[in-house]
């Protein structure tokens, strides 16, 4: 069997707020947007810079709906060049750090819809450092 990863779908309540998080804070880029008036929903496909294939599909239903807590979804993971600089940038933009990069290798942040985003340091872990080393999980 030949499998190829396509994308992860994340259902969102507020498309503008989610795009602000995924694009402005995380740095993903919109590679396609499709509005479906007859179905009353919008799909937005996002990719990390330098990737041509969508990795995240944001699905926004136009009619109000109650979405689950998000933790049962699991998470989406991205590799970053500098875990500390990335977390500092996200924190400055108001993003919640669920698990700080105490080990210099891994952190989790939360999207507006309570989806966990894992950030992994590229290559070897960085030397553990403050303020991350003593920061508790959220």
Give the location of each predicted region.
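Generic domain-boundary/flexible-linker signal
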Residues: 19, 67-69, 125-130
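Core segments of cupin and vicinal oxygen chelate
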Residues: 2, 9-53
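Active-site/binding-pocket entry motifs
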Residues: 51-52, 64, 125
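Vicinal oxygen chelate
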Residues: 1, 4-13, 31-34, 42-48, 64-138, ...
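Short, mixed charged/polar active-site loops
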Residues: 53-55, 116
């Amino acid at each position: 069997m030949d499998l190829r990863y396509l994308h992860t779908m994340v259902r969102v309540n507020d498309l503008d707020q989610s795009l602000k998080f995924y694009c402005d804070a995380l740095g993903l880029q919109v590679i396609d947007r499709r509005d479906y008036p007859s179905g009353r929903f919008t799909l937005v496909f996002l990719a990390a810079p330098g990737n041509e294939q969508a990795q995240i599909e944001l699905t926004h239903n136009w009619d109000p709906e109650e979405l689950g807590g998000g933790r049962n979804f699991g998470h989406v993971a991205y590799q970053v060049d500098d875990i500390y600089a990335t977390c500092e940038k996200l924190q400055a933009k108001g993003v919640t750090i669920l698990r700080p990069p105490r080990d210099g290798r891994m952190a989790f942040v939360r999207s507006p819809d309570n989806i966990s985003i894992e950030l992994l340091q590229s290559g070897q872990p960085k030397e553990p450092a403050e303020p991350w080393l003593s920061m508790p999980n959220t």
